[in-house]
């Protein structure tokens, strides 16, 4: 869109209106040492064709999943997104991040969020879902705060291998929440040790947290973990991948009090870290403790069904000391894309996506394990992601594979660990999997 600068006369009028003599007086409070003293180093003025050409040239330096075969995972996955998802979400009545405060003119958006909440409750086997969170990490951290508030206890126990970035977000949230503690359970064969967990959970534990599948892609012993939490009066919090729930048991069915997840894998493209989607669901007992907002169904004065924002227990709407969270917005557009995708897939569709991802991941893992020098780091069951021990550094494999237009996976050395984390989605073909194995063999 064109940008037309303000004229000198317009600037003078604005300064006069706010009672400031000149521009220098307007910025008098900004310290001299941080003021810009030189002209900005900008491109010369261009027409639209020139700007488009320049941006395309700059973007061509990116490596993206549209022109690379991707085995990247670790929280963001290359699942297929039907074109209809973007088409529907891009309709003008939906394409906004603005909160639908005016219910009378926002019934379409409110109903879409209501449907999102309903779908997530069915997928996760829970009673209530909020209108969305920033991402999976913030959803888990908010879940921990719910547990602290509900139980009045101070301790959080992480039962298995949580995503390192999620752990950092959790620590940051709890650091600001006062005298709280986080204890990490020991690992055996890539999953949390149930025996060790028994000794860690006590009457001081507010919640036991588990990620399913975990950061390594392995499946944790969630039923045993949940039983330990319940036995000690702690809340059981599960961070579950939504695609995995096409084949794995829903958290609510094995006793989760709160279930959260990262919704990127359903309807939201990988986008250099965001915007993504935080899913947060709870049992009915905790409905008044959830952060953000809910959309509820009601009746108007004529008896017609209508949708409204309800239970907005955030600090913008109620007294600060009574608020459940200071979250100030949500990811409504990302949530919309997610519910559109899941609605297009249906129950059988999400099961098919999960099943094909799982089968292809296991095929690839078996092939890689046959290569000299390569092996699976863990023997625990996994969904669509696994860790490979390699004969050469993972960084070398990733660098060499990029030359072949392949994202080989995630190098775990970034977190002080050995191994290559490989993820497989339904998009990968047998030819791509076999080619990947051949390239690994050549590098070994």
Curated annotation (Swiss-Prot):
One GO biological process term: glycine decarboxylation via glycine cleavage system
EC class (word): oxidoreductase
Keyword Oxidoreductase: yes
Record-listed E.C. numbers: 1.4.4.2
Catalytic activity: N(6)-[(R)-lipoyl]-L-lysyl-[glycine-cleavage complex H protein] + glycine + H(+) = N(6)-[(R)-S(8)-aminomethyldihydrolipoyl]-L-lysyl-[glycine-cleavage complex H protein] + CO2
Superkingdom of the source species: Bacteria
Alphabetical list of InterPro entries matching this protein: GcvPA, GDC-P_N, GDC_P, PyrdxlP-dep_Trfase, PyrdxlP-dep_Trfase_major, PyrdxlP-dep_Trfase_small
Keyword Heme set for record: no
Pfam families linked: GDC-P
Keywords: Oxidoreductase
GO molecular function terms listed in the Swiss-Prot or TrEMBL record: glycine dehydrogenase (decarboxylating) activity
Quaternary structure and interacting proteins, as annotated: The glycine cleavage system is composed of four proteins: P, T, L and H. In this organism, the P 'protein' is a heterodimer of two subunits.
NCBIfam families: PRK00451.1
Function: The glycine cleavage system catalyzes the degradation of glycine. The P protein binds the alpha-amino group of glycine through its pyridoxal phosphate cofactor; CO(2) is released and the remaining methylamine moiety is then transferred to the lipoamide cofactor of the H protein.
Family as reported in the entry's similarity comment: Belongs to the GcvP family. N-terminal subunit subfamily.
Full protein name: Probable glycine dehydrogenase (decarboxylating) subunit 1
Organism (species): Chlorobaculum tepidum (strain ATCC 49652 / DSM 12025 / NBRC 103806 / TLS)
Gene: gcvPA
């Amino acid at each position: 869109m064109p940008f037309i600068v303000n004229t000198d006369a317009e600037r003078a009028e604005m300064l006069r209106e706010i009672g400031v003599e000149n521009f220098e007086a307007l910025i008098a409070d900004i310290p001299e040492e941080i003021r810009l003293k030189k002209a900005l180093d900008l491109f010369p003025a261009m027409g639209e064709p020139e700007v488009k050409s320049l941006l395309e040239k700059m973007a061509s330096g990116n490596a993206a999943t549209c022109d690379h075969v991707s085995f990247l995972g670790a929280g963001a996955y290359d699942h297929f997104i039907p074109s209809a998802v973007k088409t529907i979400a891009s309709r003008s009545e939906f394409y906004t991040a603005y909160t639908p405060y005016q219910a009378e003119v926002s019934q379409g958006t409110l109903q879409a969020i209501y449907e999102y909440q309903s779908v997530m409750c069915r997928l996760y086997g829970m009673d209530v879902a909020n209108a969305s969170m920033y991402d999976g990490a913030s959803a888990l951290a908010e879940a921990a705060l719910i547990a602290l508030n509900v139980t009045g206890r101070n301790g959080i126990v992480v039962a298995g291998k949580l995503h390192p970035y999620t752990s950092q977000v959790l620590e940051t949230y709890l650091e600001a929440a006062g005298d709280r503690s986080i204890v990490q359970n020991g690992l055996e064969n890539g999953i949390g040790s149930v025996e060790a967990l028994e000794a860690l959970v006590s009457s001081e534990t507010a919640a036991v947290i588990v990620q399913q599948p975990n950061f390594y892609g392995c499946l944790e012993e969630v039923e045993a973990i949940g039983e330990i939490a319940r036995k000690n009066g702690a809340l059981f919090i599960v961070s579950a991948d939504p695609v995995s729930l096409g084949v794995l048991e829903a958290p609510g069915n094995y006793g989760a009090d709160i279930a959260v997840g990262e919704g990127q894998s359903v309807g939201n493209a990988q986008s250099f870290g965001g915007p993504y989607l935080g899913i947060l669901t709870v049992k009915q007992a905790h409905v008044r403790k959830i952060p953000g907002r809910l959309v509820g169904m009601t009746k108007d004065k004529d008896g017609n069904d209508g949708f409204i924002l309800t239970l907005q227990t955030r600090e913008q709407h109620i007294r600060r000391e009574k608020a459940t969270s200071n979250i100030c917005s949500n990811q409504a557009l990302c949530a919309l894309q997610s519910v559109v995708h899941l609605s297009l897939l249906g129950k059988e569709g999400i099961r098919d996506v999960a099943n094909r991802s799982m089968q292809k991941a296991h095929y690839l893992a078996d092939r890689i394990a046959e290569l000299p020098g390569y092996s699976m780091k863990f023997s625990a069951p996994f969904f669509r992601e696994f860790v490979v021990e390699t004969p050469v550094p993972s960084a070398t494999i990733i660098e060499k594979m990029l030359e072949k237009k392949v994202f080989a996976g995630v190098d775990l050395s970034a977190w002080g660990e050995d191994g290559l984390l490989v993820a497989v989605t339904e998009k990968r073909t047998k030819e791509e999997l076999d080619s990947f194995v051949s390239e690994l063999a050549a590098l070994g």
